[in-house]
Amino acid sequence: MGILLLLFAEFFFSFSTVFAKLANNIVPVNSQLFVFLRFALGLGVATIYLLSEKESFIPQRWDLVIARGVLNTISVSLFFLAITHTSVTNANMLNMTYPAFVFILAPFVVQEKVHKTGWWFLLVTMLGAGLVIDPRFLAINIGDVFGLLSAMVSGAAIVSLRLARKHESSVIILFYLMLIGTLLTAGFVFPHFVIPPGVAGWYVWAAAICGVLGQVFITVGYRYI
């Protein structure tokens, strides 16, 4: 069940990046606009759910939900910067190396045992990503750097999610993730908040909606992992 939900999450995250790139191909869009709309829309959904179910807004572990929110915001911001400066393929392939960083951090943070063969899988994963990306070391693309940094921070964000899931419900984690993300990115889009007109605007909203769905699936999915 958990694996299936994570697959759905990556499906929606991938479509979010495609829509973001399509919007940028029509008109230059501030990368933080995609991030802000994702978090603001998600905040609205999480708030409505908590109010309708009359659930408490108070988490048991403030430190974990705040860590999850801050790390995820940084990761998503870096990811959309990557999309702006490199191809969708490179951005997604680099970002999808985040499980390797989860693998590295988990034994130290969550005290999970790692089998020795896992390190070989880690090496193959990193080499495979490098082959697909085909980096030019004489002229490093800044977008690729953002993509790799996004994966690193995302790995830490997933580890914090694993810890938070031990104490909090999925909705509480999502609520604070979206709230923190909205607050941290608002300053980058206001007072010049503009959604592009026409088709580009629809792509921007589609990217935000797919991002929210991906965030929901990945948060719930790790409940079963």
Predicted segment positions?
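Structural motif at transmembrane-helix junctions in multi-pass transporters
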Residues: 25-33, 78-95, 168-171, 218-225
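Hydrophobic/small/kink-forming positions within alpha-helical transmembrane segments
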Residues: 10-14, 18, 40, 47, ...
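Hydrophobic transmembrane alpha-helices of multi-pass small-molecule transport proteins
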Residues: 117-133, 154
